[in-house]
């Protein structure tokens, strides 16, 4: 049986992208909206296209994604991560180019927690000698 839908998840900070790839013409739908409509001016289109261009599958798959959490910039990065992992499901031979481009690696940087007895994660309360 040939699979016609490929699923993967991508993450960045607190953003989670659930991504489905189906054979198509290259449309990208995010939370039932077009990407330019959902992301607005901060839209980083090149990040979403990079996994497809790396694997020579540009405009061969339609993307349907649901995004939750985080800000818009983190959501774009999570979407690119999810697309990369879904492309890996379509063809295991995509692993080498995606890995060389660094698209399969999850960005582990997250906000550092606030510590008690301090103003923030690193900032201290003002110190007075007298």
Curated annotation (Swiss-Prot):
Annotated keywords: Ribonucleoprotein, Ribosomal protein
Query: Which stretches of sequence are listed as region Disordered?
Result: 109-130
CC terms in the record's Gene Ontology section:
cytosolic small ribosomal subunit
InterPro entries associated with the record = Ribosomal_Su5_D2-typ_SF, Ribosomal_uS9, Ribosomal_uS9_bac/plastid, Ribosomal_uS9_CS, Ribsml_uS5_D2-typ_fold_subgr
Per the record, the similarity remark reads:
Belongs to the universal ribosomal protein uS9 family.
For this protein, the record's NCBIfam families field holds: PRK00132.1
| Name under which the protein is recorded | Small ribosomal subunit protein uS9
What is the organism of origin for this protein?
Answer: Desulfotalea psychrophila (strain LSv54 / DSM 12343)
| Name of the gene encoding the protein in the UniProt record | rpsI
